């Protein structure tokens, strides 16, 4: 029969001990390491009981106080409902809003509907790692950005004080699409001789204006006022006014001459039009460019360049010819960081573009 515990020790929970000087210690049964708890018996017993529950429950146990407090907390999924309304109030384009919604849907699938303050960096990192492991680093990067923005809005409304996304690593997505050089442009342009006449004109206009294919297809003659082509970019909503006196010296392209040819040869309501003088879709333009690229006989490392690469080529040529700031304005980018993604060689006011 074991030695009877003293009166002071008789009612203590397992792993809690009292020293002769009345000081309480908790001994971790896994390691034998002791932790001091002070001389307050009631507090020491409460701490020891909670520690025993945490160590031996076999699952993540949430303290009663945390459960009580969480009744007044906003959960992640309910906050995402609120975040969707915040996005809608920003006045962003429908296409951009749809892209946000797809990321929010992925977040709902990947994270529990727990109180915002209980969502951990570890849980977020695990979700993002799942995408990276599947070779979807670009998706992981976009989801992380959306989730971080959602938590920033929650902080702004006072629901939480820290952003658990901030400590996660941003996924590095490798862009595999090849850049297009000026010489390669000329070879594809030459190969496009057998294509419909509008393809060459679309290529010229893409390089001299630096705009996306979707915006090129939407350009109308009525958008030209007092020597400026007014473009509201469909992707970002950025409004820019491009001087029709622009020219790309490296390729011998004059915007005025290209516009004159479009009016004389195509003669549609839109600047780029089909042989029937009807508007063209971005898919049609991109598809015919792909055919001309294949006909050129050029080979590329990585994914071959699409029509979109003419925008990057434009930025790089204007950077050399005029300045990087000019290229940034022309592309409609808000930050130097984003503009540099297009300028590198890969190895609700109108912004009036001025040639300086």
Swiss-Prot record:
Its EC number is 2.7.7.-, 3.1.-.-. Residues 74-155 form the Core-binding (CB) domain. InterPro entries: CB, DNA-bd_dom_sf, DNA_brk_join_enz, Integrase-like_cat_sf, Integrase_catalytic, Integrase_lambda-typ_DNA-bd_N, Integrase_recombinase_N, Phage_int_M. Bacteriophage 434 is a lysogenic phage that shares extensive DNA homology with bacteriophage lambda. It inserts its DNA into the E.coli chromosome at or near the lambda insertion site. Complementation of integration functions between the two phages has been demonstrated. Belongs to the 'phage' integrase family. Residues 175-355 form the Tyr recombinase domain. Integrase is necessary for integration of the phage into the host genome by site-specific recombination. In conjunction with excisionase, integrase is also necessary for excision of the prophage from the host genome. The gene is int. CDD domains: INT_Lambda_C (cd00800). It comes from the Viruses. This is Integrase.
